[in-house]
């Protein structure tokens, strides 16, 4: 799963001189893209679920499984595995055979010799999430599965203050022989195979490379994937080059009947991957230079910035001036949530007593979500009724709740009911004990963030609540959130798999300070979460997920605003591009024209 900045932009633009189309070596195919926010690190255990970072890593690292690029609904395929895993009858033991003859990209740590991928590399990659040295915020993905022996290894390292013992074998993750990987869960999980398809959470990492670079491993990712890192200017540009040792797989999936899937499959037939020699990713944080650069031909495709949707697709149709240039348009509802959370341990907005719950509900009802959707999101997107997004299990289009309501009158009534009233006549409400009431929302500093803040300020003022803003960068806010020093903050979560259970896991008590940023802890919710995760998808699981969603609406640790809609533009000559709702490692399938002489 991936965190994204709330409104998809951040704080600064590249200098104008950087926006000219760069020269490329004649005949080479160079895919050119732009990110709207900077990456964090290129170490998979330290990404903090950052969307852009994980997207880059997914081109470099490989998991045993992956998604069929052109299949809809999503379907799993073996990647480095010979076949899909064998699963025990109780849903706890997953055994997979890694294909022989797959090699890591060249690196000095290998001493000039080819380094074959083996099952032990996956065991090592999993163990790194448990190593206290790396303090991984994504550890919860494994901890919740209770892999036998791994938490104990971590606890031993913490208590002894000694290095994590990677050499000790445990049942949770074990190499049975050179190519056979066995993962044992402490609790059944019918959807664990989705984690086995995540190139970041289960991408193979070579121990020699980590030992070689030590604490600087975040700048030196090495994997078995189609691309390798060629250069990296932090927060500015990432360049990936074709991995010359890549095995040159071909697309062998089952494409959907959709015309885009059929056209892509026809183009990919028999072609060895990747189709491009290089990928250049610029970080262009402000939307205008990103948009203008696409129009100038610098980038091969672009997720249309929200502020330019009216220019790109008036009335949801591709603008004629773009169509005449051969540019094409794709749209898709994201499996995501745009939300803000309340830190549940904060003395003002946290807590589980009726007055604190009433305050959070009032804030949620007072926020003008329709204004957010109609202004910044240009009317695109779907009002959210729960934390569970479209395209995932547990999502119900007919589910309706207070989460999607904008009702200032009801907000005022709740505030009055619980004693949040204006006692001194200055126009601002005080707390029930008469002390000052001042909300503080954490935020980035971009123009997009300022727009969101204006809506928050106006909404809160309308019901008599003061609101100030704490401005910081995206990485700084991530750190503060993990440290529990924010009162309120907002961002987006994007699904990494079809399992909607993750969007309940962000409120699961044991995940506090990891994915559970509000540190919500409610035993009744935790029991529902634990029960649903053991069940296969079906009516019984759906019913439990609905009850869990009801509790999140009632206690309001999150105010979820909407599920966003993505618009992609592609330049003429871009072939085999069809956005997948979950798959990140798709750059190897994209084809672009070679550079002209």
Model-derived features with residue positions:
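N-terminal export signals
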Residues: 4-21
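Extracytoplasmic/periplasmic ligand-capture domains
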Residues: 21-25, 69-70, 85, 93-136, ...
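A short, structured loop/turn motif at beta-sheet edges
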Residues: 88-90, 176-180
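Surface-exposed intrinsically disordered loops and tails
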Residues: 148-162, 167
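Active-site-proximal polar cores
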Residues: 561
């Amino acid at each position: 799963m991936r965190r994204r900045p709330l409104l998809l932009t951040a704080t600064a633009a590249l200098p104008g001189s950087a926006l000219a189309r760069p020269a490329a070596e004649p005949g080479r195919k160079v895919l050119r893209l732009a990110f709207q926010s900077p990456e964090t690190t290129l170490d998979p255990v330290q990404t903090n679920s950052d969307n852009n970072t994980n997207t880059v890593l997914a081109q470099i690292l490989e998991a045993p499984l992956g998604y069929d690029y052109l299949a809809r609904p999503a379907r799993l395929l073996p990647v480095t595995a010979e076949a899909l895993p064998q699963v025990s009858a109780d849903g706890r033991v997953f055994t997979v055979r890694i294909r022989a003859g797959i090699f890591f990209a060249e690196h000095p740590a290998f001493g000039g010799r080819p380094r074959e991928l083996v099952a032990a590399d996956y065991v090592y990659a999993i163990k790194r999430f448990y190593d206290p040295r790396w303090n991984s915020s994504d550890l919860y993905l494994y901890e919740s599965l209770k892999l036998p022996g791994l938490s104990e290894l971590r606890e031993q390292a913490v208590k002894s203050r000694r290095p994590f013992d990677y050499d000790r074998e445990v049942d949770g993750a074990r190499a049975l022989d050179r190519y056979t990987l066995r993962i044992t869960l402490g609790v059944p999980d019918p959807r664990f195979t989705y984690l086995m398809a995540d190139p970041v959470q289960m991408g193979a990492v070579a121990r020699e490379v980590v030992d070689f670079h030590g604490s600087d491993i975040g700048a030196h990712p090495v994997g078995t994937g189609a691309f390798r890192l060629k250069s990296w200017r932090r927060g500015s540009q990432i360049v990936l080059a074709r991995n010359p040792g890549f095995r040159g797989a071909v697309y062998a999936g089952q494409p959907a009947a959709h015309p885009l899937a059929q056209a892509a499959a026809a183009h990919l037939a028999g072609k060895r991957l990747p189709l491009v020699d290089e990928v250049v990713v610029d970080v262009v944080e402000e939307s205008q230079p990103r948009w203008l650069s696409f129009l100038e031909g610098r980038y091969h495709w672009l997720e249309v910035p929200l502020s330019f949707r009216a220019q790109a697709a008036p009335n949801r149709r591709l603008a004629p001036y773009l169509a005449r240039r051969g540019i094409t348009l794709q749209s898709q509802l994201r499996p995501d949530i745009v939300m803000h959370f309340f830190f549940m341990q904060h003395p003002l907005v946290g807590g589980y007593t009726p007055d604190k719950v009433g305050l959070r509900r009032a804030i949620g009802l007072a926020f003008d979500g329709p204004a957010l959707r109609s202004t910044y999101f240009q009317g695109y997107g779907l009002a959210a009724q729960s934390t569970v997004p479209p395209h995932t299990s547990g999502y119900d289009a007919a589910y309706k709740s207070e989460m999607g309501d904008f009702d200032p009158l009801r907000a005022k009534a709740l505030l009055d009911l619980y004693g949040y009233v204006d006692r001194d006549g200055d126009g601002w409400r005080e707390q029930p004990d008469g002390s000052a009431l001042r909300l503080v929302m954490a935020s980035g500093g971009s123009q997009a963030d300022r727009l969101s803040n204006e809506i928050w300020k106006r909404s809160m003022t309308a019901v008599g609540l003061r609101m100030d803003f704490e401005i910081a960068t995206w990485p700084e806010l991530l750190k503060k959130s993990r440290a529990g020093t924010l009162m309120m903050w907002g961002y987006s979560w994007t699904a990494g798999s079809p399992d909607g259970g993750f969007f309940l896991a962000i409120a699961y008590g044991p995940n506090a300070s990891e994915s559970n940023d509000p540190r919500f802890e409610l035993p009744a919710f935790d029991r529902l979460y634990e029960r649903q995760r053991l069940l296969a998808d079906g009516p019984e699981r759906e019913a439990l997920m609905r009850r869990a969603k009801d509790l999140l609406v009632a206690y309001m640790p999150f105010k979820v605003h909407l599920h966003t809609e993505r618009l992609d533009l592609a330049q003429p000559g871009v072939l085999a591009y069809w956005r997948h709702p979950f798959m990140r490692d798709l750059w190897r399938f994209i084809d672009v024209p070679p550079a002209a002489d």
